[in-house]
């Protein structure tokens, strides 16, 4: 049984994230979506909210589990007996950071592979940062996130649906 971990801040979970989860869940026996605490990123949603959002969006996948974590990714990977780390690459700008991170993870976890997936064409430009900014400024994010995520955003911002 091959277990993979897909770590991220998921602030919020977008259609691009779900696209990668859907595709990775078809490759691995079990996919653990690791929602990172990431206090240095100053997330818009709390860790508990981000876990709740991810569980709402991904709850229909039978082999996907959503867990929060803080600390080193290597510890989360080991605690879940994972053999693969899944990462998404939207553009060349993501590659340099992800390449360095994969190298560090290989050093810390020599028996764990990093697998890069690119999003489907319609999701290549979506980022949580863009979604939050558009939502805060009153724009329509319905093409980028699921209805439940849009509701979470509207509640957090304090705007009616």
Swiss-Prot record:
Membrane-spanning parts: none
Enzyme class: transferase
InterPro entries: Cyt_trans-like (IPR004821), PPAT (IPR001980), Rossmann-like_a/b/a_fold (IPR014729)
A single cellular component GO annotation: cytoplasm
Entry keyword Transferase: yes
Cofactor: Mg(2+)
HAMAP family: PPAT_bact (MF_00151)
Role: Reversibly transfers an adenylyl group from ATP to 4'-phosphopantetheine, yielding dephospho-CoA (dPCoA) and pyrophosphate.
Protein name: Phosphopantetheine adenylyltransferase
Gene source species: Cupriavidus necator (strain ATCC 17699 / DSM 428 / KCTC 22496 / NCIMB 10442 / H16 / Stanier 337)
Lineage of producing organism: Bacteria, Pseudomonadati, Pseudomonadota, Betaproteobacteria, Burkholderiales
